[in-house]
Amino acid sequence: MHFSLVLLVFAAIVIPICADTSTTKDYDDKKSLQTSNFGTAAVANMLHVLQSSDNSKRLLRMNDKAVISDHEEERSSLVKNKQKKLSYRIKKGWENVKKPFKKSAKIIEKPLKKGSKIIIEPFKKVSKIIKKFAIKGAKIVKKPFKKSARIIKKSFKNLN
């Protein structure tokens, strides 16, 4: 269709400049058209070919498909190029973002390593002290229960 429109526009602009009378032939159908104006003869001939000839219709369809496929190839290549550029920019930007964080992470890790030793040591000492008191307290707590358990056992024996 696009091809036929281009030919029609070409016929409307260029052909009126040519001679007044002409004879054009459609070699596919062996018919001749004779008109007084070369421009109208060309347009009539083209319309006749478009309407009657299956070969020309096939050629036009193939031309349209070729144009569409060319546009799709161009479009897909443009999309691929833009995706590559975008991914490249994202990688570069991400590297620029990561670098300061890596440096600051190292700066933060060093005091934390030193500070963790300072923080952990008192907890170790305190936990040892707590364990000692917990063991002593458990013994203190167990003793009355042992006594009461003995008393309860004796009372059950007396009941039987």
Curated annotation (Swiss-Prot):
Record GO cellular component, one term: membrane
Signal peptide stretch: 1-19
Motif (RxLR-dEER): 58-75
Chief site of localization: secreted
Keywords, ordered alphabetically: Host cell membrane, Host membrane, Host nucleus, Membrane, Secreted, Signal, Virulence
Highest rank taxon of the organism: Eukaryota
Location relative to the cell: Secreted; Host cell membrane; Host nucleus
Family (UniProt): Belongs to the RxLR effector family.
Entry remark concerning the domains of this protein: The RxLR-dEER motif acts to carry the protein into the host cell cytoplasm through binding to cell surface phosphatidylinositol-3-phosphate.
Protein name: Secreted RxLR effector protein RXLR-C11
Gene expressing this chain: RXLR-C11
